[in-house]
From Swiss-Prot:
It catalyses: di-trans,octa-cis-undecaprenyl diphospho-N-acetyl-alpha-D-muramoyl-L-alanyl-D-glutamyl-meso-2,6-diaminopimeloyl-D-alanyl-D-alanine + UDP-N-acetyl-alpha-D-glucosamine = di-trans,octa-cis-undecaprenyl diphospho-[N-acetyl-alpha-D-glucosaminyl-(1->4)]-N-acetyl-alpha-D-muramoyl-L-alanyl-D-glutamyl-meso-2,6-diaminopimeloyl-D-alanyl-D-alanine + UDP + H(+). GO terms for biological process: carbohydrate metabolic process; cell division; cell wall organization; lipid glycosylation; peptidoglycan biosynthetic process; regulation of cell shape. Cell wall formation. Catalyzes the transfer of a GlcNAc subunit on undecaprenyl-pyrophosphoryl-MurNAc-pentapeptide (lipid intermediate I) to form undecaprenyl-pyrophosphoryl-MurNAc-(pentapeptide)GlcNAc (lipid intermediate II). PANTHER family: GLYCOSYLTRANSFERASE, UDP-N-ACETYLGLUCOSAMINE--N-ACETYLMURAMYL-(PENTAPEPTIDE) PYROPHOSPHORYL-UNDECAPRENOL N-ACETYLGLUCOSAMINE TRANSFERASE 1. Pfam families: Glyco_tran_28_C (PF04101), Glyco_transf_28 (PF03033). This is UDP-N-acetylglucosamine--N-acetylmuramyl-(pentapeptide) pyrophosphoryl-undecaprenol N-acetylglucosamine transferase. It comes from Acidovorax ebreus (strain TPSY). The lineage of its organism: Bacteria, Pseudomonadati, Pseudomonadota, Betaproteobacteria, Burkholderiales. Its EC number is 2.4.1.227. GO terms for molecular function: UDP-N-acetyl-D-glucosamine:N-acetylmuramoyl-L-alanyl-D-glutamyl-meso-2,6-diaminopimelyl-D-alanyl-D-alanine-diphosphoundecaprenol 4-beta-N-acetylglucosaminlytransferase activity; undecaprenyldiphospho-muramoylpentapeptide beta-N-acetylglucosaminyltransferase activity. Residues 1-30 are annotated as: Disordered. It is found in: Cell inner membrane. Residues 1-21 have a biased composition (Basic residues).
Length: 399
């Protein structure tokens, strides 16, 4: 069975940024406006604009980048992608029709002293490789969305005096974006108050997330067992895989939710065994093709709290129980989840506190009216114009 199943701030501008903006976005002319337009139309040949997108490592960086890349392509842009060989971005990006530009660079966190000592040489080599890509492509704009590959690419963009736009998806900034934000032409964030002088626009996402019916329309007239969607992400979530089947087994079969459980390809067989051992039926899938529709169809989503997941749930307006990944850098998944939880738009359960019996009791006490209230509050926090705003900035800077 197959499941059917984000304070606005002025853009970053210092004195030098204003000067750059004047050069890039056009200064006052002594010619009448119509004369300038006529001369431009006749003297400038049509030129295909080029963007270089930089994002890698995890889906949380890559999927917002793909949303931007697809929107730029729809506007006639040629889009190239800077990434690393053998990475998730190399698997996901080329099949979508974008040219992949590989450079050799990876993270150093948690990889030992030897890797850390080799960092200066590796970084210098990656910057040279990225600079060669920028020189060859001569992009009109360079867009960084995080991941280690963004840092050498961002340095190369600024050395070549190309406009550099950054987008930070998480509520706690990553190292590459934190360092590059001082050099960037524009800085955007998915959550408020993340970086100085940044514009809070939300997270770039596909239109499907912003076009779902409002919660009160979706849930009107629903009866019967609750519909529970468990989302483990592309790599799966072992804690959810272990605990959810046990929790469901505590619930009498006639009161048990209808469950769709997504886990990564590498964990799907172990997940099947967990459900079989618990004697619980569920729809199990390694991947959800239409996540927006899945969120809309569910009464409740049980999930991690990656930036994309949190902002997409807000965009759809869905009730969710967030179980942050406890080993996320700077515990950013907890602060991501708190964005919705603090306004009553969901629940936050730390993984250390998640038990089968506790989850079973929580699920048994949930009523659709309460879930509707949570979904409505989550939707009040959505910011859905990030893709539009960043693409518009690209087009202004490319003139």
């Amino acid at each position: 069975m197959t499941s059917r199943f984000g304070h606005s701030h002025h853009p970053r501008r210092g004195r030098s940024a204003r000067a750059r903006a004047g050069r890039r976005e056009g200064v006052q002319s002594n010619f009448p406006a119509t004369q300038v337009l006529e001369r431009s139309a006749h003297s400038l040949p049509a030129r295909e604009r080029t963007a270089l997108v930089m994002a890698g490592g995890t889906g949380g960086h890559i999927f917002p980048g793909l949303a931007l890349a697809e929107a730029l392509r729809e506007r006639g842009w040629q889009v190239h992608w800077l990434g690393t060989p053998g990475s998730m971005e190399e698997r996901l990006v080329p099949p979508r029709g974008f040219a992949f530009e590989p450079i050799d660079f990876s993270g150093v966190r948690g990889k030992g002293l030897k890797t850390l000592l080799a960092l200066p040489l590796r970084l210098a080599r990656a910057c040279l490789q990225a600079r060669a890509v920028v020189r060859r492509l001569q992009p009109d704009v360079v867009i960084g969305l995080g991941g280690y590959v963004t840092f050498p690419g961002g340095i190369a963009a600024r050395l070549a005096r190309k406009p550099l736009l950054l987008h930070e998806q998480n509520s706690v900034p990553g190292m590459a974006n934190k360092l590059l934000s001082r050099l960037a032409t524009r800085v955007y964030t998915a959550f408020p108050n993340v970086l100085p002088d940044a514009q809070w626009v939300g997270n770039p996402m596909r239109r499907a997330f912003t076009r779902q019916p409002r919660p009160e329309r979706r849930l009107a007239g629903r009866e019967g067992p609750l519909r529970l969607l468990v989302v483990g992400g592309s790599l799966g979530a072992k804690a959810l895989n272990d605990i959810v089947p046990q929790a469901l087994a505590w619930i009498h079969e006639q009161d048990r939710p209808i469950v769709t459980h997504q886990s990564g390809e590498s964990q799907i067989e172990a997940l099947r065994r967990s459900y079989a051992a618990a004697g619980v039926e569920a729809t199990l899938t390694p991947f959800i093709e239409d996540t927006a529709a899945a969120f809309a169809e569910a009464d409740l989503v049980l999930c991690r709290a990656g930036a994309s997941t949190v902002t997409e749930i807000a965009a759809v307006g869905a009730a969710a129980v967030f179980v942050p990944f406890p080993h996320a850098v700077d515990d950013h998944q907890t602060t991501n989840a708190q964005y919705l939880v603090k306004v009553g738009g969901g629940w936050l359960v730390q993984q250390a506190d998640l038990t089968a019996h506790g989850l079973a009791e929580m699920l048994q006490n949930m009523k659709r009216q309460d879930l509707l209230a949570k979904a409505q509050k989550a939707r009040t926090m959505r910011k859905i114009n990030a893709t539009r705003d960043i693409v518009a900035a690209c087009e202004r800077l490319a003139r």
